[in-house]
Design a protein with these regions (language model features):
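Surface-exposed intrinsically disordered loops and tails
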Residues: 163-190, 234-264, 399-470, 521
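Solenoid-repeat scaffolds in large eukaryotic assemblies
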Residues: 125, 217-218, 224, 385
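Short acidic-aromatic linear motifs embedded in glycine-rich loops, typified by GG[WY][YF]DAGD(H)
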Residues: 1-109, 116-151, 168-180, 184, ...
């Protein structure tokens, strides 16, 4: 995607160089976390470096997949841009537009925050630096910060920012790139430029979850969702409402991954590619059978989608669950081989292996729901957590239920019964994570009466108060749902780690991940032991000389 920005000051152009460097890391989290996670396994074509990731090897020196150098390239570019943009503005005070400056600085602050958050989630450590550097060689003598320290630094950066500008300012690319039409521009390409950078609210919500500040996470995420649902453009007869699992979201499930361009209503932020401008990743080459086919879905991971115990069906008599999300996986030979087709196309293909320019979503509608449910559950607001996981607000609210204090942050704009605009009632409303797909209810506990004795031992809930039993059980149910919702997005392993840290119990990670090694019991035991021993992060010696640069 190339747009003429020659009319703008040349000092602002480097922000696009940051985006280019982010394109280079867009698919890394998928290879690094999902290959170690609950679903993916090698094929006959898997290279040695990727096999080492799958095998949980302790020494990854020189491993081209594990090398974090390209993440640090983004940080170096962010620091360089921040310094040079300030220097330029300081010498051109009267010619630099204040709103543009705030928007560009704030966007860069958020990109840097997101990059460090990714390092924290993948490696559990990173070297933090704010001063200009040229390469990783300039920082290897510094002491790395651990996960908790990095999350604190991300929170500080997001809210303190640079040059008095924090991460709350938005850059309106519509107005910057299409000044003739300004904010009223209907050009979808420009609107997608607004999704190049994660928003403040979604970064703040995820950071708050890592810090255990569930009130802030819930207030932040629910506030933005409710605000968006109330916009005039989403009232009345609208099939797709931004950030809402409603309308055609379920019947058209999958197009948010395989359409030619990202869906505006389902996407919060996205990494875009265009092969015509040499902007590519290698997802299709890794996953597609017409490419190098280096990774595939394991049999145990694939069978979870149809397992009525793991994934309840709406039909109590069904012998297997029909879940639209299973379209992400292609059955090659039943119970033997399953390939990933999530990025190739469920019904039609908008991308090819030769082009390999499928976009990679950073945050989308599902992320917001899962963060909201996680926050609500750990605040003890079990009723709305269960409703958002299952049927959604619409049928619950429409039943005439009087919403109590637990529902703070969710309002009538999630439903349709009291939402009127220009004489129209909203046609579609929230149907929840599972309800929009016509699935059965996941067993989200709400009261001590819901606690099942047979689950206490299975999920290691012994010794916890009833309230904590409910919270931990629901957290594990959220993780199980994430396996179905986020295959091959680089998101399930970090969620498992966050839940495990919360309860100081890593056994469920070992259990879920270990299932895909069932054909090699010795390897299964080895991997489970490593996870229980703390090897859930990708190991990398930041003080060593094994980095590519």
């Amino acid at each position: 995607m190339v747009i003429d920005i020659s009319r703008k000051a040349a000092s602002f152009i480097p922000v696009f160089c940051i985006i280019t460097k982010i394109q280079a890391i867009g698919d890394k989290a998928i290879y690094l976390t999902d290959m170690r996670g609950e679903l993916l396994e090698p094929t006959e074509n898997t290279p040695a470096d990727l096999y080492s990731i799958y095998n949980y090897d302790d020494d990854l020196s020189g491993n081209t997949y594990a090398d974090p150098a390209k993440y640090y390239d983004v940080i170096i570019a962010c620091n360089d841009y921040l310094q040079k943009a300030k220097e330029y503005r300081d010498t051109h005070v009267t010619t630099v537009d204040d709103d543009d400056y705030r928007g560009l600085i704030s966007s860069t602050v958020r990109l840097k925050t997101w990059t460090y958050l990714m390092l924290a989630k993948i490696y559990g450590q990173a070297i933090w630096f704010d001063d200009p550097m040229q390469s990783m060689k300039d920082i290897v003598s510094r002491t790395p910060k651990n996960l908790s320290e990095l999350v604190d630094e991300c929170d500080k950066l997001l809210n303190t920012g640079f040059d008095g500008i924090n991460g709350t300012y938005n850059m309106s690319w519509n107005e910057w790139l299409d000044p003739a039409n300004g904010a009223t521009s209907t050009n979808d390409e420009y609107k997608r430029w607004n999704m190049m950078v994660p928003g403040y609210f979604v970064l703040q919500a995820e950071i708050a979850l890592w810090k255990g500040d569930y009130q802030k996470a819930a207030t932040t995420i629910l506030g933005e969702m409710s605000r968006t649902f109330a916009l005039a453009e989403y009232q009345g007869n609208v099939a797709n409402i931004k950030y809402m699992r409603s309308g055609s979201y379920g019947s058209n499930y999958g197009q948010q991954y395989d359409s030619e361009m990202p869906m505006l209503t389902a996407t919060e932020s996205v990494i875009m590619y265009d092969y015509k401008y040499n902007q590519q990743n290698s997802l299709l080459n890794h996953f597609d059978r017409s490419g190098s086919y280096m990774m595939r879905a394991s049999v145990p991971g694939s069978k979870r989608f149809e397992d009525t115990t793991f994934n309840p069906s709406a039909d109590a008599t069904a012998i297997k669950t029909s879940d639209a999300r299973f379209r992400a996986i292609q059955e090659i030979e039943k119970d033997v081989e399953y390939a990933i087709r999530k990025y190739r196309g469920f019904r039609k293909s908008g991308h090819t292996v030769a082009h390999d320019d499928t976009y990679i979503m950073i945050y989308h509608t599902s992320d917001l729901y899962f963060m909201a449910i996680e926050a609500l559950n750990n605040m003890g607001r079990f009723e709305p957590a269960s409703v958002l996981m299952n049927t959604g607000v619409d049928p619950f609210y429409g039943a005439g239920v009087v919403l109590g204090e637990q529902w703070q942050g969710l309002n009538c704009n999630w439903g349709l019964w009291t939402t009127l605009y220009a004489g129209f009632r909203r046609t579609y409303a929230d149907n929840g994570v599972r309800g929009i797909l016509g699935l059965g209810k996941r067993d989200m506990w709400q009261t001590p009466e819901d606690i099942k004795e047979e689950i206490i031992a299975e999920q290691r809930l012994e010794g916890l108060s009833d309230e904590d039993k409910i919270k931990k059980h629901n957290d594990i149910e959220l993780v199980k749902e994430a396996f179905l919702e986020f295959p091959c997005e680089g998101k399930t392993y970090p969620l498992m780690i966050r839940v495990a840290k919360r309860w100081n119990d890593y056994s469920f990670i070992a259990d879920f991940v270990g299932q895909k090694y069932e054909s090699d019991l010795a390897k299964q035991a080895e991997v489970k032991a490593k996870i229980m021993g703390g090897a859930y992060f990708v190991p990398w010696d930041l003080q060593g000389k094994s980095s590519s640069h």
